[in-house]
């Protein structure tokens, strides 16, 4: 027997996200063939996300009570994964009227990395935790790592330190049994399969990550009372389109004339506040 071979009960880690594409000779295909192939692969993403719903539910149900006590969400990632975390976090203030400090996206390499690659940033195992401590992270907060491969050192280092400090950790990955998932209290494994262009995780993996991030923040915000019926009653009135939309929400709820509803909205600054003030007399 080879003494270098060790038996292990741990499930094997397979980088499915980097396996060869199911398609070849892409440069020989017509534009229509390429588009249809990509669309065919994209249809697998929603199915993979659906299978992950039980884990997404577990994470959301742990996040909500923490946020009711003043907790926050920190997304952590590199490259596409980091950018998607920043994107989702940046949509929370305008959509739900919450402060930008409630859900924070951190990307390896900082804001520069949103547009340009930052060399070796994702390989730094300590910088992620340093950034979290700069935000005074505490045990009411949640850290969610995002990495298709599940191997990003910047993310894994931060999650490991967070767990050591009793902070809830989750993750979104496209590979089973990854090192990142090992650092997550609640791992979300979204197995979308090989990418159309081998290893290009901005494709199916990125699409699935965005879907799951939407699900997490939308369900959390609904649970926190930031939606009424099916409407964004706490949205920020940052342009004429949204002022008009908010005005029509008030008309639907209160039956007022347009000008009166708009004046009420502008006076109180949000649909919810305007409706509550009107009903209070």
UniProtKB/Swiss-Prot annotation:
Gene3D superfamilies: Glucose-6-phosphate isomerase like protein, domain 1 (3.40.50.10490)
Catalytic activity as recorded in UniProt: N-acetyl-D-muramate 6-phosphate + H2O = N-acetyl-D-glucosamine 6-phosphate + (R)-lactate
Entry GO MF terms: carbohydrate derivative binding; carbon-oxygen lyase activity; ether hydrolase activity
Keyword hit for Transcription: no
SIS domain mapped to chain residues: 63-226
Keyword Lyase among UniProt keywords: yes
Role played: Specifically catalyzes the cleavage of the D-lactyl ether substituent of MurNAc 6-phosphate, producing GlcNAc 6-phosphate and D-lactate.
Record-given protein name: N-acetylmuramic acid 6-phosphate etherase
Annotated organism of origin: Bacteroides fragilis (strain ATCC 25285 / DSM 2151 / CCUG 4856 / JCM 11019 / LMG 10263 / NCTC 9343 / Onslow / VPI 2553 / EN-2)
């Amino acid at each position: 027997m080879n003494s270098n071979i060790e038996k292990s009960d741990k499930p094997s880690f397979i980088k499915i996200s980097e396996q060869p594409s199911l398609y070849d000779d892409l440069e020989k295909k017509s534009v229509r063939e390429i588009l249809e192939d990509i669309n065919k692969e994209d249809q697998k993403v929603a199915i993979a996300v659906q299978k992950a719903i039980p884990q997404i539910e577990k994470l959301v149900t742990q996040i909500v009570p923490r946020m009711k006590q003043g907790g926050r969400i920190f997304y952590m990632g590199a490259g596409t994964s980091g950018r998607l975390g920043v994107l989702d976090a940046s949509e929370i203030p305008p959509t739900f009227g919450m402060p930008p400090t409630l859900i924070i996206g951190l990307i390896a390499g900082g804001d520069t990395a949103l547009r340009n690659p930052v060399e070796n940033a994702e390989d730094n195992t300590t910088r992620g935790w340093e950034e979290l401590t700069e935000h005074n992270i505490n045990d009411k907060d949640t850290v969610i790592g995002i990495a298709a491969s599940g191997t990003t050192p910047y993310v894994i280092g931060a999650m490991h330190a967070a767990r050591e400090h009793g902070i809830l950790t989750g993750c979104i990955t496209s590979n089973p049994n990854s090192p990142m998932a090992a650092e997550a209290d609640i791992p979300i494994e979204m197995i979308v399969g090989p990418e159309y262009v081998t290893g290009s995780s901005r494709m199916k993996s990125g699409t699935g990550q965005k879907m799951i991030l939407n699900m997490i923040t939308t369900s959390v915000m609904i649970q926190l009372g930031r939606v009424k019926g099916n409407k964004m009653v706490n949205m920020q009135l940052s342009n004429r389109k949204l002022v008009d939309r908010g005005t029509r929400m008030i008309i639907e709820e209160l039956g007022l004339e347009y000008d009166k509803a708009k004046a009420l909205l502008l006076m109180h600054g949000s649909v919810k506040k305007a409706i509550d003030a009107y009903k209070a007399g």
